[in-house]
Curated annotation (Swiss-Prot):
Pathway: Secondary metabolite metabolism; methylglyoxal degradation; (R)-lactate from methylglyoxal: step 2/2. Thiolesterase that catalyzes the hydrolysis of S-D-lactoyl-glutathione to form glutathione and D-lactic acid. Belongs to the metallo-beta-lactamase superfamily. Glyoxalase II family. The gene is gloB. GO terms for molecular function: hydroxyacylglutathione hydrolase activity; metal ion binding. Transmembrane segments: none annotated. Zn(2+) 1 binds at residues 53, 55, 110, 127. GO terms for biological process: methylglyoxal catabolic process to D-lactate via S-lactoyl-glutathione. This is Hydroxyacylglutathione hydrolase. Zn(2+) 2 binds at residues 57-58, 127, 165. Binds 2 Zn(2+) ions per subunit. Monomer. Its EC number is 3.1.2.6. It comes from the Bacteria.
Amino acid sequence: MNLISIPAFQDNYIWLLANRQKHCVIVDPGESAPVLATLAQGQYVPQAILLTHHHNDHVGGVADLRHHFPDIPVYGPQETAKKGATVIVNDGDSLTIAGQNYTIIAVPGHTLGHIAYYSSPYLFCGDTLFSAGCGRLLEGTPEQMYASIQRLAQLPDETLICCAHEYTLSNLKFAHAILPADQDIATYQQQIEQLRSKNLPSLPVKLQFERKINVFLRCNDIDLQRKIGTTSPPDSLVSVFCELRSRKDSF
């Protein structure tokens, strides 16, 4: 499989996953022009569009892409029905597109109907889990978002996180501010600074590594809890998540 990150807007990524026959899926096309250019350059043949949620920077290119490819199915959660989705999918559904199997995972939090698509090893998770961070809670509750990222964290170590924004460096700066002595975070921040200085993407990233440098996946870390002045029994780690999310919102 060939995975391509297509830059869009200021910091979005539209994902394209193609097989050897150059049949591909397009994930969260916020705009059509860069997608059409990539399709033409690589002679890819789109088989489906996958939408994770209803925000315009993820669905804005759907109408024009369907103008160019009238028969292409557009999969998405119920909240995208008025944003171009032609096939509504729900938690636990399975899709087979261009010989690749996809499992739908409900991940409410950023929006109430947000979903992710998992096709081993690829995880297209929209604005739920970012490298070294997570999405803002625009519609859902902290409990929902914490449960969602924990659900994604249970996927296999080799899972490749294909999120929709280049937020890695800013997320690492926040993580370093919380845990300044953490060498994994400090070293990775330096690596990403070099990468971004060359305008290269920081994504995708393996989940196994993400568990080390993403503070939102480390709410049970005693040292982290001490640093933010929050201690929680295992059944209320969401309070640690809430404190982290609140601090990140104002960082």
